[in-house]
């Protein structure tokens, strides 16, 4: 989602930087960090934080005078100066504007601290100071004493805590509580999570008091399940229950927005369409609002007056939004919606949108290894499953720039798509000959190598996509109006506009984190006149039924913004067409209390000190167990035990989630499943215990699968070193390669070599699905070489005729060194903190922005600067061409467009009865050409 507010800059540092400083004098904060702005930038410790209720409230409390309009004006003025001639006057003016822009965006009133060690947490609660200085002048930019504010559900899992300026933290905490009844009892971790909703990135939209709050619709039905109980012993007890009473909250996290008011929100968000769902926030309010014509339903049933949860009667014709109690988390802390709304106005809450369903739905997406590791396919079928991905890589290797564009931008582009980006894919749209350029070709080659590596670890392209989930909305209407609950969808049925239009009859539904084949379900895609009448406009939602186990199968999916991956890939349908049952985990509860700040901090401590592994560790262990399972015949004692262990990982994964909610987890992951030492037989063991340990010793999953060498570089190095050493030994002793010996050992000595190779091998090379895919991709590309074409004269296409001062070529050395250092620091930080893809993207954007600011301080004219950097990287072959695109991407595209009449050409799909210009992956395309307007404006591309 595009943010309508600019990203603010906050300090984010590890706790060790703060607490290792000497203690200060009495009366001052105990811990203090003195650091320069340049240090923060170079170490990626000045990070972006998107607009949220907290940011907007602090602006108001502090009185910062922040103005988004002024930010836009400054960016435009900077754009004008970077487009004007170089002069000292312009240079000084540019630096002044950059400083004003930085001062507006810099936000020292909140900071994020990564707790390096558990013992640091309590020290940080005592308070600390961060002083930020100007590197050149030594001037103090900010000096802030911080106190504890909160942690979010996502941040605490990474041991990250937010602290706020001590002068404003109490008022901010008061506003966050929004006048709630403080005597109400809650589970501390849950209330902490509800309060943390104020940190969600969001765009405010039109507010309304015309809101109806209704109770959730909960149904139950009998079904067959596998029940796991982890409360009594380390290894969860599994029970087959044939008539399990399955409960389902059909409105868990979703409500309605009138179609008229949805159009107002679409306009607020500057959209040219009305989304099928808005993921919203308000005070203690979270979930998806679906544009649904509940007023037309009222006309059909002839009922217009509905009682809300407080007993107040509302005319549905006067209602803009319908909330459910699962959305308004603290509904019982208010006496009416009017009281809630009054507090929201007092504390400046309003409805805001964090995300919305897209206008164009992806035609293709890639799988991950969790989605495909449990496939039951023959080797031939498995190869056919990955073949389109292999062929795609080979096509991109060629010199047809059209194939490259289809790969880079996907197959979902339309005539209306805004295709202009500041990267080489847009350059190819403007001039296809640039596919021969050495700099661009090197980026394509790097992309191909990465794509091969990704394919080895299960990133396989299929027809399918992620879409937001919703349960049969008519059921909520029937519930609200007191009608019989029937819904429009039956068991195993879904409605989805995308799949209906594609003619799909059935799809596979999956959702991460996925552990076992029990987490998959094949569902039927249906429609009829009644479904089209009520749901036909909801493009971007997967509407599921309210009478089966799909939510339970897909890792406890709910309706507050969760999405599911669906695909009609024939091999995934075939590979998952098997008999399986949903796995249900028995869960403990936590007593409710009247919560204080101490309770929230105790929840933090519980997470930081928790011995329960995170979900990622658990799912990786399940993958390792799945790999070991491949060694044994299906149905054997070993296979059945390992199959149980994979299913038990669903319980262990749930334990990790429950730990974050403050639930006490009595047992950790069974060590005997992953450690041979736990299976060591002792002399005093009973006969039964010796037999158990002997059996367990045969099926220990203590290694990562072979394909994980593409995920963990150090693992790959270890394996490569072992293979190199053993290959030399085999050639010397046996006159055969290591692979030849492994495949067919001829002597006892060779068999011993095979045995010890597998013992010392850091990875498990069992023939599991993912290892097979790894080997297939490796075999396919073992002699594969990327094109290495260098035609330096293509650099002239990227430049204009404008000259530049030759001093720039020398002055760029320092900027290039900063580029290398900052990217090295980014990679190091990512390896340590295991940041998400969105966090990595944000960090990379920060680097680009900071480097651009430094570049303009060297020379204010961006056209001349661009020409200089083109020469700098092309005259020095060892310099990264990515440096050029980071600094000058916008100007490069502008240069190319101005030379080609501002035209771009890109591939779009054609219908069966239309002529096509080329085929790619079995799909038919034509090149569509259009004129791009307004790109000379700084804001358009930037």
What are these regions (language model features)?
Residues 553, 566-581:
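Short active-site loop/helix that positions an aromatic residue
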Residues 582-586:
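Active/binding-pocket-proximal capping segment
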Residues 1-555, 572-574, 588-942:
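Conserved small-residue
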Residues 508-510, 564-567:
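Short hydrophobic-aromatic micro-motifs
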């Amino acid at each position: 989602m595009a943010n309508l507010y600019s990203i603010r800059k906050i300090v984010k540092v590890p706790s060790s930087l703060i607490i290792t400083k000497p203690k200060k004098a009495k009366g001052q904060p105990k811990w203090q960090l003195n650091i320069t702005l340049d240090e923060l930038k170079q170490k990626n410790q000045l990070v972006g934080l998107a607009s949220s209720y907290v940011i907007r409230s602090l602006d108001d409390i502090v009185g910062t005078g922040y103005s988004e309009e002024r930010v836009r004006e400054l960016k435009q003025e900077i754009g004008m100066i970077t487009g004007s001639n170089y002069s000292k006057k312009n240079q000084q003016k540019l630096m002044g504007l950059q400083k004003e822009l930085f001062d507006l965006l810099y936000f020292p009133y909140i900071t994020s601290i990564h707790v390096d060690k558990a013992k640091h947490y309590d020290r940080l609660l005592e308070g600390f100071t961060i002083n930020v200085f100007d590197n050149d002048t030594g001037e103090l930019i900010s000096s802030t004493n911080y106190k504890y504010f909160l942690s979010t559900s996502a941040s605490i899992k990474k041991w990250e805590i937010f602290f706020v300026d001590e002068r404003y933290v109490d008022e901010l905490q008061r506003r966050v509580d929004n006048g709630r009844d403080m005597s109400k009892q809650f589970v501390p971790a849950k209330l902490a999570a509800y309060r943390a909703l104020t940190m969600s990135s969001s765009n405010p939209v039109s507010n309304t008091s015309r809101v109806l709050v209704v109770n959730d619709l909960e149904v139950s039905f009998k079904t067959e399940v596998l029940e796991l109980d982890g409360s009594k012993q380390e290894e969860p007890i599994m029970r087959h229950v044939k008539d399990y009473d399955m409960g389902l909250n059909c409105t868990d996290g979703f409500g309605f927005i009138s179609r008229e008011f949805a159009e107002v929100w679409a306009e607020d968000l500057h959209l040219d369409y009305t989304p099928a769902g808005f993921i919203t926030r308000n005070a203690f309010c979270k979930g998806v609002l679906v544009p649904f014509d509940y007023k037309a339903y009222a006309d059909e049933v002839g009922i217009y007056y509905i009682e809300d949860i407080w007993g107040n009667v509302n005319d549905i014709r006067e209602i803009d939004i319908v909330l459910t109690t699962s959305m308004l988390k603290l509904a019982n802390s208010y006496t009416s919606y009017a009281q809630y709304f009054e507090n929201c106005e007092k504390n400046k809450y309003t409805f805001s949108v964090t995300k919305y369903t897209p206008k164009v739905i992806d035609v293709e997406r890639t799988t991950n290894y969790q989605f495909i590791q449990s496939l039951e396919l023959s080797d031939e079928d498995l190869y056919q499953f990955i073949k389109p991905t292999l062929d795609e890589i080979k096509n991109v290797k060629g010199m047809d720039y059209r194939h490259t564009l289809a790969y880079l931008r996907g197959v979902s582009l339309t005539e209306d798509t805004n295709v202009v980006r500041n990267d080489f894919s847009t350059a190819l749209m403007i001039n296809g000959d640039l596919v021969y350029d050495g700099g661009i070709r090197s980026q394509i080659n790097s992309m191909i190598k990465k794509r091969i590596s990704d394919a080895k670890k299960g990133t396989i392209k299929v027809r399918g996509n992620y879409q937001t989930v919703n349960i049969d909305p008519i059921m909520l209407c029937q519930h609200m109006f007191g009608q019989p609950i029937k819904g429009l969808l039956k068991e195993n049925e879904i409605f989805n506009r995308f799949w209906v239009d594609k003619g799909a009859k059935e799809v596979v539904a999956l959702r991460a984190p996925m552990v076992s084949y029990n987490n998959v379900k094949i569902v039927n895609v249906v429609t009829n006149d009644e479904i089209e009448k009520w749901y036909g406009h909801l493009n971007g939602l997967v509407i599921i039924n309210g009478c089966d186990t799909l939510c339970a199968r897909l890792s406890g999916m709910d309706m507050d913004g969760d999405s599911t991956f669906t695909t009609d890939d024939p091999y995934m349908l075939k590979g998952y067409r098997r008999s399986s049952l949903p796995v249900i985990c028995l869960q403990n509860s936590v007593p409710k209390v009247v919560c204080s700040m101490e309770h929230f901090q105790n929840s933090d401590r519980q997470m930081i000190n928790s011995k329960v592994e995170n979900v990622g560790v658990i799912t990786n262990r399940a993958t390792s167990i799945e790999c070991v399972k491949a060694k044994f015949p299906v149905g054997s004692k070993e296979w059945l035990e390992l199959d149980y262990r994979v299913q038990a990982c669903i319980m262990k994964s749930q334990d990790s989630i429950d730990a974050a909610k403050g639930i006490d987890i009595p047992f950790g992951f069974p060590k005997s499943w992953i450690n041979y030492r736990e299976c060591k037989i002792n002399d005093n063991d009973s006969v039964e215990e010796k037999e158990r340990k002997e059996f367990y010793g045969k099926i220990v999953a203590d290694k990562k699968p072979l394909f994980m060498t593409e995920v963990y570089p150090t693992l790959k190095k270890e394996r490569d070193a072992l293979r190199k050493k053993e290959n030399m030994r085999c050639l010397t002793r046996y006159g055969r390669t290591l692979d030849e010996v492994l495949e067919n050992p001829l002597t006892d000595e060779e068999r011993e070599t095979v045995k010890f190779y597998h013992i010392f091998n850091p990875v498990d090379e069992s023939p599991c699905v993912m290892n097979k895919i790894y080997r297939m991709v490796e075999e396919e590309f073992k002699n594969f070489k990327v094109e290495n074409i260098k035609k330096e004269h293509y650099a002239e296409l990227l430049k204009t005729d404008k000259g530049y001062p030759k001093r720039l070529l020398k002055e760029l050395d320092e900027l290039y060194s900063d580029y290398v250092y900052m990217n090295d620091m980014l990679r190091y930080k990512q390896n340590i903190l295991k940041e998400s893809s969105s966090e990595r993207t944000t960090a990379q954007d920060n680097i680009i922005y900071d480097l651009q600011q430094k570049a303009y301080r060297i020379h204010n004219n961006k056209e001349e600067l661009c020409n200089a950097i083109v020469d700098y990287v092309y005259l020095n072959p060892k310099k990264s061409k990515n440096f050029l695109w980071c600094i000058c991407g916008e100007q490069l595209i502008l240069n190319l467009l101005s030379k080609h009449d501002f035209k771009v050409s890109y591939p779009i799909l054609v219908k069966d009865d239309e002529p096509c210009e080329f085929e790619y992956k079995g799909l038919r395309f034509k090149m569509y050409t259009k004129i791009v307007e307004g790109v000379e404006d700084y804001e358009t591309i930037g």
